[in-house]
Amino acid sequence: MPIQIEQTWYKHPLSMNLYGLNFTKENIKETGICYLFESEKSVLQMEGFDMLNCGVAVCGSNFNKYQLNILMRECAPKEIIICFDKEEQGNEDKYFNKLYNIGKKYSNYCKFSFIYDREGLISLKDSPADKGEEIFKTLLNKRVEVH
């Protein structure tokens, strides 16, 4: 959404950015892992966890080549873990395929995996980080690898 400061309008294309990368870049380099969230809130929630914050947000529900290039150039993660919000019930196959296809599309660049809640640990539209560190780690340990 554009913002006006004095007589000048500024706009920021969200698809050309990764929220939080400026703060988490060194952690991603150190661990080789990047958690890819939809919203900025999830990146901020990770700050309260007893683990390194390796999260960035795409500020939406899509991940594109431009954002991947930013990640690879700035910190070259060995694995990108897609941690998108849980989507509508009844469309589980569609949601699973969406996450899988994002990872598959870019799997030549690094390892991809994604969090897929099979056990109902998070509610509809929740981020994997919304229920706290313990649930996040449980989901993380059961993530789906993209081959």
Segments (PLM) and residue ranges:
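TOPRIM fold recognition
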Residues: G48-H147
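Phosphate-handling DNA/RNA-contact segment within nucleic-acid enzymes
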Residues: M1-C75
